């Protein structure tokens, strides 16, 4: 498990304005993955969508002001042969319930990149001297035990951190 976030600090006498604040950028050495995300509607939440990564940018996002059953701030990259109990899977979860962007990009060198954070549309944050802004954490997990292994890792992590 790896958790990433970014902290912006203003040490200038002049104010600075952030127009984008992504939490993490992760590069993978190849593009041989399928992207899995969870979309849905009322009474049909968390519909699993799975499709092969392709050149260019593929994204999921929400600008509703919160995460919801329509789009969840989560995506996974699974090898084509990965199933519920075997195969390599990377899982990415943004610990945030506001406007978000989660995207993958495949470049002309056949490498894949995952970018996740606060959606830049309608985002603007001004910092004065001595002020800071911390992005929400993006949590990344890896499993060689398929989608169930990834899910169990997330479950154990969040259950150990969240006490009801």
Predicted regions: what they are:
Residues 1-105, 121-123:
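Polysaccharide-binding surfaces and accessory modules of carbohydrate-active proteins
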Residues 6, 141-154:
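Short, surface-exposed, low-complexity cationic segments
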Residues 92, 125-144:
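Short Pro-Gly-centered flexible turn/kink motifs
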Residues 111, 159-160:
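Feature activates predominantly on carbohydrate-active enzymes
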Residues 111-127:
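Short acidic, Pro/Gly- and aromatic-enriched capping/linker segments at domain boundaries
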Residues 162-164:
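Conserved small/polar residues in nucleotide/adenosyl-binding loops
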């Amino acid at each position: 498990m790896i958790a990433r976030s970014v902290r912006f600090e203003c040490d200038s006498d002049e104010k600075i304005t952030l127009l984008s604040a992504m939490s993490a950028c992760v590069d993978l050495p190849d593009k041989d993955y399928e992207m899995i995300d969870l979309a849905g509607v009322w009474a049909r939440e968390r519909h699993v969508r799975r499709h092969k990564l392709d050149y260019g940018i593929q994204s999921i996002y929400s600008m509703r002001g919160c995460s919801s059953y329509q789009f969840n701030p989560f995506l996974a990259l699974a090898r084509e042969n990965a199933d519920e109990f075997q195969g390599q899977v990377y899982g990415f979860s943004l610990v945030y319930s506001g406007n978000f962007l989660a995207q993958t990009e495949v470049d002309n060198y056949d490498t894949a990149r995952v970018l996740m954070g606060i959606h830049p549309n309608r985002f603007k944050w001004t910092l004065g001297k001595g002020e800071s802004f911390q992005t929400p954490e993006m949590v990344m997990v890896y499993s060689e035990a398929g989608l169930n292994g990834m899910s169990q890792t997330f479950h154990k992590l969040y259950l150990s951190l969240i006490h009801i």
